[in-house]
Amino acid sequence: MPQPVAEHPGFSPARVQLAILALALGGFGIGVTEFAAMGLLRSIADSFDISEPQAGTVISAYALGVVVGAPLLTVWTSRWRRRTLLMVLMGLFTAGNVVAAFAPTLETLVAARFLAGIPHGAYFGVASLVAASLAGAGKQARAVAQVLLGLSVANVIGVPMATWLGEAAGWQSAFLAVGVIGAATVIAILVVVPEPTVGVVVRAREELAALARPQVLATLAVGAVGFGGMFAIYTYIQWTMVDVAGIDRSWMPAVLAVYGLGMVAGNILGGIIADRDLDRGLLLIATVMTVILALFAVAAHHPATAVIGLFLVGTTGSALVPGLQTRLMRYAGRGQ
């Protein structure tokens, strides 16, 4: 990613908060397009006359875009200014969702989802760095949590609304709405996010070298295992809740909102814990998450326990993020 940014002491707390809100708006849009697709699988499957597992390729394509995009953009954009990069990333995201909305075939939709996923990791990485630099020492994890709060709020408001919109007006309308959010984010970043002063240039080799550091690798491993478990549950959550727990399909927007509330709670809690004791806090959260993921297999067979379990999955999964992001920034050094 681009060079480190110094703090901006001339900005008022209100200006800083407004900039972080603009960054969170992008996280909101990303959260909607990432998670709403899982609630729209049946509609997508019906539209193209395919099975739900086949429709699941639109989720896999997005995930592949995330995996491919993060390292490639790290190398290609190492000398870019952060505000410029953030706008370009959201431009790609917007384009991917607009193409998805008008996709005439499954293949086009899969390609569009791949494109929309490419900016995902880089956006959150750069946005977190900008937010942390604006917040200053002692408040960095909470600033990161505020950016990521957009992702959590998406699951409370955006995903249920997108699911409802997709059911009422077709899944295409949900992706088009996300495209509008992406375009609004580009404008918001241009207007309220400060252009950092030029600092020390970080070369791509230094950024890639950070991946070889044991602490960085350990942090990435914790994230891979934790989020892998979370998404293993969430990817087919509609099938689990409807066919296993016995919840009526019409209640899915409300169920997804419960998951989103868990993410909001976890995001706030995770930021507070990370600022107090980063490593011990992450260990505690990861341990609790492991237990909850294991118990969900049993909880999923009853409507009440399935919903409670989903809330806790969202809480613990989201609580990991601020601490992991802050830890990566701490140990990556110049490679951040």
Predicted segments with their positions:
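Paired small-residue
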Residues: 92-99, 107-116, 304-312
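Intracellular juxtamembrane helix-capping segments at the cytosolic ends
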Residues: 123-135, 319-332
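Conserved MFS/SLC helix-loop-helix module at the cytosolic interface between two early adjacent transmembrane helices
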Residues: 68-106
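Helix-breaking motifs and short loop linkers at transmembrane-helix boundaries and internal kinks
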Residues: 49, 81, 102-108, 246, ...
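Cytoplasmic helix-loop-helix junction between adjacent transmembrane helices
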Residues: 112-150
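C-terminal membrane-cytosol helix-exit motif in multi-pass small-molecule transporters
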Residues: 179-199
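C-terminal transmembrane helical hairpin of 12-TM major facilitator-type secondary transporters
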Residues: 280-324
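Helix-to-loop junctions at the C-terminal end of transmembrane segments
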Residues: 70-81, 266-278
